[in-house]
């Protein structure tokens, strides 16, 4: 049996372990005389996955190799079929994953996809990033009472993400997902599109993370537990533009990341570039990623851009901490104003 709680999915046998770290979501209540006047002290760091926390699409690490299918051929077919059928590209890739597996006589089930998450490669420093950010905030003067929550919003597969080493660090994961008991076939239960990602930013903002609840009802800004101004979105390209634009328009923040393989004119860029000579195709893709980040920055879609090096002391870490400093200062200003009545 598969149990659904908020945006995460898990089986009964691991429910106890996961429930201990599950985000507690409650509808905002009216303040009482005994409550603090200002309670919006939560900062939300929201991440894309493919290309942001991991160098490649998650399907390329285990699923496609298991089928003996080249990644470039699979994605080209997805694009071709989606255009020919006038279909959603994300539903198309989820359909083709099952179709290819069936052709090979392989069964696609939840347990196998979760296991594939163990093979997903992460950028340097990602595993230690969450702890380093927590330690930074705890040591930050004026950050008493401020907490940081990490969220994942991805068009990738929830099942594969659950198998990664970093799943435990997220307060909630909103990603595409299969429905495995639909006519005894895997069927897309939820698809997270580029523009659809913004729905989940509103869910975080309003504190309505249970996907069974509508977010369309009006909620006053004062009643929303995590203001957009307390959010930072991390993404790597065009698919993240709607999310970046939403946050920037509402006082929030965004950081664009690119492969550390890319070369830039920044003196610090060489620190993040790994040794060795990567294939020409990877270098070209990395340069295109850097170019896209520069375009996003020039267009005002992000506050900063940096190599996807998540180690403490990297450009990405330092620039994220600058935004945290700013948000903490804003929280303190609002808290002081609230105390004045």
Predicted segments with their positions:
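Generic secretory/membrane-interface signal
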Residues: 6-8, 42-44, 230, 234
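Polybasic, lysine-enriched low-complexity intrinsically disordered terminal tails
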Residues: 1-32
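C-terminal cap/substrate-recognition subdomain and adjoining C-terminal extension
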Residues: 118-151, 155-341
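Alpha-helical substrate-recognition element adjacent to the catalytic core
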Residues: 27-182, 300-303
């Amino acid at each position: 049996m598969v149990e659904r709680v908020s945006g995460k999915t898990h089986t009964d046998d691991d429910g106890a372990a996961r429930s201990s770290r599950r985000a507690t979501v409650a509808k905002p209540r009216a303040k009482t005389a005994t409550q603090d006047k200002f309670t919006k002290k939560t900062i939300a760091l929201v991440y894309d996955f493919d290309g942001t926390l991991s160098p490649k699409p998650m399907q390329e690490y285990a699923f496609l190799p298991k089928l003996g299918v080249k990644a470039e051929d699979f994605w080209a077919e997805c694009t071709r079929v989606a255009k020919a059928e006038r279909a959603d590209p994300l539903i198309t890739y989820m359909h083709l994953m099952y179709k290819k597996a069936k052709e090979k006589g392989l069964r696609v089930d939840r347990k196998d996809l979760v296991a594939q998450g163990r093979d997903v490669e992460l950028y340097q420093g990602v595993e230690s990033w969450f702890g380093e950010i927590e330690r930074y905030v705890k040591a930050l003067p004026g950050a008493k009472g401020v907490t940081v929550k990490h969220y994942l919003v991805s068009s990738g597969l929830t099942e594969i993400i659950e198998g990664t080493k970093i799943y435990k660090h997220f307060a909630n994961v909103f990603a595409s997902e299969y429905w495995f008991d639909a006519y005894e076939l895997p069927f897309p239960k939820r698809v997270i599109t580029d523009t659809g990602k913004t729905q989940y930013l509103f869910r975080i903002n309003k504190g309505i993370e249970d996907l069974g609840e509508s977010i369309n009802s009006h909620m006053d800004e004062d009643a929303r537990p995590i203001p957009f101004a307390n959010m930072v979105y991390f993404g790597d390209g065009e698919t993240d533009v709607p999310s970046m634009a939403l946050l920037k328009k509402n006082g929030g923040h965004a950081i664009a990341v690119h492969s550390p393989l890319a070369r830039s004119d920044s003196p610090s860029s060489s620190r993040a570039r790994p040794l060795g000579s990567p294939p020409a195709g990877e270098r070209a893709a990395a340069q295109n990623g850097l170019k896209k980040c520069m375009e996003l920055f020039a267009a005002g879609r992000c506050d900063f851009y940096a190599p996807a090096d998540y180690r403490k002391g990297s450009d990405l870490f330092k620039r994220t901490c600058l935004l945290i400093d700013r948000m903490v200062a804003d929280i303190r200003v609002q808290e002081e104003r609230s105390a004045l009545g």
